[in-house]
Regions:
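Catalytic-core "active-site belt" of small-molecule-metabolizing enzymes
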Residues: 1-147, 161
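Conserved metal-binding segment of the jelly-roll/cupin
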Residues: 166-177
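Glycine-rich, small/acidic residue-mixed loop/short-helix segments
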Residues: 150
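Short alpha-helix capping/helix-loop boundary micro-motifs
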Residues: 157-159, 176-177
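Extended mid-to-C-terminal alpha-helical interaction segments
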Residues: 159-163, 167
Length: 177
């Protein structure tokens, strides 16, 4: 497989440069997942949305895509949990290039149940997270891009930049909610 199957992608906002990192397959798990045996250093979690390509995307296709065209290439979505991890002593304060070398501070990815993709009003979507006995957190409409699909054109250009086609079934998790 020339193009890795699982990716993370995102940016701080719509005007920021999007960053992308392939994810090691051994650290991508279906929900429910037990992460106790996985080696973490500074573990945290982020609630995210993952999108799955429903068809192959060639480099020529990716080169000209806009967001609406890219949306039509997605067949499914799911809630995902990225286990964020830092292998640098500075953790989240590490320089950007260090974070990029660290798979953008990635530890593992848990994928929920896939459902057919449909555009939603992301400004109204709730994310409620409870971990053990910690206080529950709730976020509404807080995705930094406003719509997780916004990153699709940049991500697809990135993953096809070496001339390889992104196969159907390729997955991207789209940044914290």
């Amino acid at each position: 497989r020339a193009v890795p199957q699982h990716w993370k992608s995102g940016g701080a906002n719509r005007t920021a440069e999007m960053t992308h990192a392939p994810l090691p397959p051994q650290g991508v798990w279906p929900s429910p997942a037990d992460a106790r045996q996985w080696p973490f250093f500074h573990r945290g979690i982020e609630g995210e949305i993952a999108l799955r390509l429903g068809q192959d995307v060639t480099p020529a296709q990716a080169a000209t895509l806009d967001v609406e065209q890219a949306r039509r290439l997605v067949d499914a979505m799911c809630v995902s949990i990225e286990v964020v991890d830092f292998r640098w002593a500075e953790a989240g304060a590490a320089p950007t290039w260090h974070k990029m070398a660290d798979s953008l501070s990635h530890g593992a990815l848990v994928l929920g149940e896939w459902v057919p993709f449909q555009p939603l009003d992301w400004s109204r979507q709730r994310c409620v997270a409870t971990i053990g006995r910690q206080p529950t957190t709730e976020h509404v409409g807080t995705h930094p891009l406003g719509d997780p699909a916004f990153l699709l054109p940049a991500w697809l250009r990135h993953i096809t930049r070496t001339g390889h086609t992104a196969p159907a079934g390729t997955v991207v998790t789209t940044g914290t909610w």
